[in-house]
Amino acid sequence: NTHIGDARATDMVQAGEFNIGQLVREHHSGDGVVLVGFATNRGTVVAADEWGAPMEDMMVPPGAPGSWEDVLHQAGNQDKLLILRDKAENPQWTEARGQRAIGVVYNPAFERYGNYVPTSLPRRYDALLYIDESHSLHQLHVVPQINVPPELYPWGI
């Protein structure tokens, strides 16, 4: 979400940061591009607790009180696809609330301190897929082929 959601709808803009979502909206808004975010109230995720650490299955605790995850859970604990374009002028939707950021690095111990990004949903995304309870993906165990160059060759060297 920190990559695809428009950075101008978060606190990233105060830090002078931008992302793919913002660039796509600025340069391709008339091309039918749709920014789709993701949120979950609780479940499990595959991530590492710091850069360079091994991946592991981690528990994702319920969304923080007042966060978008909590609000969507309280609205009915079923999965939802929210089309947000028509909510851009509705104060209930444009209010900035915390939205959980889970990436390849995630540490539930810092859940209340650094895993939430203040977000105006309809300004950040065109749509949001909300899964009330998510389950981590199962890793694919790829067997490398010795005589074939890596997929990123030569850039991955």
What is the meaning of each model-derived region?
Residues 3-157:
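C-terminal regions of proteins
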